[in-house]
């Protein structure tokens, strides 16, 4: 059966390229709904569950928590999982071409109605949790949730859940009777509340002023009861809670507020997911404002094992198309710079609006900017995410106006048709899913980029000027000679092009407000890796390698120079390989493939091999006095501690909240049950000062979290 399957797959691929049709999910493992660790071929549709569709009126909240006329946007409106199921079954979501749904946090939230500034507020958004092992009754019960998962999977759609382990719900230190006092429950049993927190489940350091990363991590986000992740009970609780949801078939996790949780704990947490029974794609929210870059954001994306929402991309697209404050040249500069900054650019989740920013569509304005921004995002590097209602041109500035009830399910809008036309390209053309990005033609109003992967290529041309057409000359591409029609079929005033020998495109005029996509898909005769997921793991974990041209007979996978063959190859298909991470030195390494005929692939760089199972340890050093501009770092004998390399040392450490200067601390993900040798160093002004004396030693716990405290050695 296996060899016959491969022959059928090869035939299907050949026919699809000849006829220009999309393949069903079964034909290509990398594009399948079963591919839970890589989302490069997917299009995500973000749903605020309460605001999408009310499919079951019997679960609507009673009393003051519910707004029957939907006039108070801070109350529940009735959207639920059954409503989403209905929109899958009636073809609205499948017809649009989306292949993953990102839904609100599904866990039980508080039912209290809280009055802020005279206005009643509720947990409709899902971010005021009380029990991470129960469902939000307003969305449905576990049977409803399982039905959503099963229905989505039956229609080749993945399900991503929002998950917010940063906090529970609003609390007032001086008023235990406020709301539900931030109470945390474990499957119905109270673990503790913010007041009288004898178990140390929460931080009690006041509210953050957002002045520093440290302040945002170890203080409350607004009035939300902030979780103490350096607590064994909390660590175990969240690991068991997420395993419950993953066991139901969830395909991905979006983590809320990753900037506001200890980075070491998050790395340890996601490593437990990747090494568990249900590894899935993960991405987090690290908010960046317009024109803002953040080295800590880049470091988190490259080191934590978790991917991120691409706020830098989103803010630039909004400035270029929505606000017209930046040019297309600026846009390409962001595309180029982010591709060099982020190690895993194909995993960054791109978007143009969401529940935390003004809707992209501006009230009273034309719709072409929205349509062009969608076209770019659907064909750009990364994993595109579309906010519910953007395809219906919903408007609304700020919370809660950007979270109104879905206004329409019209399948005839131009935006809906743009998504419908371009979303399938992510599965049919690997250049869109995995390709590099090159600028081919640019001025202030026009950008033409090429996506290329192996022998497949696509050109995307956008003229944002709604009143002036532009003559395009001197355009070169990787497209073979021939005539190419616009994938959008002129929906956004695009045109066909003719390509001559050497990839030269015959001169043409790009219409005012015009957008076109031209593409070519070819079979690969040589192996080409497009993505590897997860991007972090320990020996014994299974990784998925997606791409093209691997062939139908197992060859060899390499982690650095260490070969994986035989039983180390879990499965081998032309577009996907699953392999076991071998026993290799921990740290960043390359992953490559050699086919059974001996042809070598490109190298996927920066796969992060962990030493072993991870736990979180707080390292604290006292009496570490420094001069202005000098900070304290941690370095040690494990790869997770930089392998004694000062350039890879952990830090800079913190010294203002949990402990104060001259004490310094940092929460670090380190190998479990392992004796560590470590020291602290001072870095500043290009100078490194090592701690004196012998190495500190500490044996990490086999599970949970730990703390080690030492004095600086002069």
Swiss-Prot record:
Top-rank EC class of the record's enzyme: transferase
Binding sites annotated in the UniProt record for substrate: 127-128, 167, 220-223, 254, 259-260, 355, 399, 403
Annotated stretches, region: B: 166-229
Site (Transition state stabilizer): residue numbering on this chain: 356
Ranges for region D: 524-610
Active-site residues, Swiss-Prot/TrEMBL: 256, 285
Pfam family, one: Alpha-amylase
Top-rank taxon, per record: Bacteria
Amino-acid positions noted as binding Ca(2+) 2 in the UniProt annotation, renumbered to this chain: 166, 217, 226, 260
Alphabetized InterPro entries for the sequence: A-amylase_C (IPR031319), Alpha_amylase (IPR006046), Carb-bd-like_fold (IPR013784), CBM20 (IPR002044), Glyco_hydro_13_cat_dom (IPR006047), Glyco_hydro_b (IPR013780), Glycoside_hydrolase_SF (IPR017853), Ig-like_fold (IPR013783)
Binding locations of Ca(2+) 1: 54, 59-60, 78, 80
Catalytic activity: Cyclizes part of a (1->4)-alpha-D-glucan chain by formation of a (1->4)-alpha-D-glucosidic bond
Ranges for domain CBM20: 609-714
Stretches the record annotates as E: 611-714
Comment text on domains: May consist of two protein domains: the one in the N-terminal side cleaves the alpha-1,4-glucosidic bond in starch, and the other in the C-terminal side catalyzes other activities, including the reconstitution of an alpha-1,4-glucosidic linkage for cyclizing the maltooligosaccharide produced.
Protein name: Cyclomaltodextrin glucanotransferase
Native source species: Paenibacillus macerans
Organism classification: Bacteria, Bacillati, Bacillota, Bacilli, Bacillales
């Amino acid at each position: 059966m296996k060899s016959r399957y491969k022959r059928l797959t090869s035939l299907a691929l050949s026919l699809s390229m000849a006829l220009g049709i999309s393949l069903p999910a079964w034909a290509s493992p990398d594009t399948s709904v079963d591919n839970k660790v890589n989302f490069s071929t997917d299009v995500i549709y973000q749903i605020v569950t309460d605001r999408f569709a009310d499919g079951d009126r019997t679960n609507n909240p009673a009393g003051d928590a519910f707004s029957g006329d939907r006039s108070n946007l801070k109350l529940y409106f009735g959207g639920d999982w059954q409503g989403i199921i209905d929109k899958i079954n009636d073809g609205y979501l499948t017809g649009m071409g989306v292949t993953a749904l990102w839904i609100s946090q599904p866990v039980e939230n508080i039912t209290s109605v809280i009055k802020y500034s005279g206005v009643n507020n509720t947990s409709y958004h899902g971010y005021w949790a009380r029990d991470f092992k129960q469902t939000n009754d307003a969305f449905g019960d576990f049977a409803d949730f399982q039905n959503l998962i099963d229905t989505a999977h039956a229609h080749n759609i993945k399900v991503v859940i929002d998950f917010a382990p940063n906090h529970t719900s609003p609390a007032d230190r001086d008023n235990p009777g406020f709301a539900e006092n931030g109470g945390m429950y474990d499957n119905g049993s109270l673990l503790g509340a913010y007041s009288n927190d004898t178990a140390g489940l929460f931080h009690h350091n006041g509210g953050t002023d957002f002045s520093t990363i440290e302040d945002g991590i170890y203080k409350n986000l607004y009035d939300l009861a902030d979780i103490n992740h350096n607590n064994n009970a909390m660590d175990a609780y969240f690991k068991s809670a997420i395993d419950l949801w993953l066991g139901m078939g969830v395909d991905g996790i979006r983590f809320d507020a990753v900037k506001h949780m200890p980075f070491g704990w998050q790395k340890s947490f996601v490593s437990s997911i990747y090494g568990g029974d249900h590894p899935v794609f993960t991405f987090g929210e690290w908010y960046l404002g317009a024109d803002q870059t953040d080295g800590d954001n880049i470091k988190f994306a490259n080191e934590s094992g978790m991917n991120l929402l691409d706020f830098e991309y989103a803010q630039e697209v909004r400035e270029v198309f929505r606000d017209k404050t930046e040019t297309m040249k600026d846009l390409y500069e962001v595309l180029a710079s982010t591709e060099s900054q982020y190690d895993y650019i194909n995993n960054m989740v791109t978007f143009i609006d969401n529940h935390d920013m003004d809707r992209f569509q501006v009230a009273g304005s034309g719709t072409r900017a929205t349509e062009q921004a969608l076209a770019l995002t659907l064909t750009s590097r990364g994993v595109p995410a579309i906010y519910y209602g953007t395809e219906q041109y919903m408007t609304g500035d700020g919370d809660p106006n950007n979270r109104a009830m879905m206004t329409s399910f019209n399948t005839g809008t131009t935006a809906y048709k743009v998504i419908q036309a371009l979303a399938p390209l992510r599965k049919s053309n690997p250049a869109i899913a995995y390709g590099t990005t090159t600028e081919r033609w640019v001025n202030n109003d026009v950008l033409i980029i090429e996506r290329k992967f192996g022998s497949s290529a696509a050109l995307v041309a956008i003229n944002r000027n709604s009143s002036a057409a532009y003559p395009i000359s001197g355009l070169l591409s990787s497209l073979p000679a021939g005539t190419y029609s616009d994938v959008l079929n002129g929906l956004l005033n695009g045109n066909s092009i003719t390509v001559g020998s050497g990839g030269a495109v015959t001169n043409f005029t790009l219409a005012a407000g015009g957008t076109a996509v031209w593409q070519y898909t070819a079979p690969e005769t040589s192996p080409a890796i497009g993505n590897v997921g997860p991007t972090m793991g320990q020996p014994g974990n299974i990784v998925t390698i997606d791409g093209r041209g691997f062939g139908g007979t197992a060859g060899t996978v390499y982690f650095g120079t260490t070969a994986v063959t035989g039983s180390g190859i879990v499965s081998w298909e032309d577009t996907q390989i699953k392999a076991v991470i071998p026993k290799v030195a921990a740290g960043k390494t390359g992953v490559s493939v050699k086919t059974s005929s001996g042809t070598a692939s490109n190298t996927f760089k920066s796969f992060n091999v962990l030493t072993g199972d991870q736990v979180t340890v707080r390292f604290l050093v006292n009496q570490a006095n420094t001069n202005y501009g000098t900070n304290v770092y941690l370095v040690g004998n494990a790869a997770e501690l930089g392998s004694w390399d000062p350039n890879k040392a952990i830090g800079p450490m913190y010294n203002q909240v949990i402990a104060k200067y001259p004490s310094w601390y940092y929460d670090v993900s380190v190998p479990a049950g392992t004796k560590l040798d470590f020291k602290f160093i001072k870095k500043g002004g290009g100078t490194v000062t090592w701690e004196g004396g012998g190495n500190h030693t500490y044996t990490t716990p086999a599970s949970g979290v730990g703390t080690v405290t030492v004095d600086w050695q002069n």
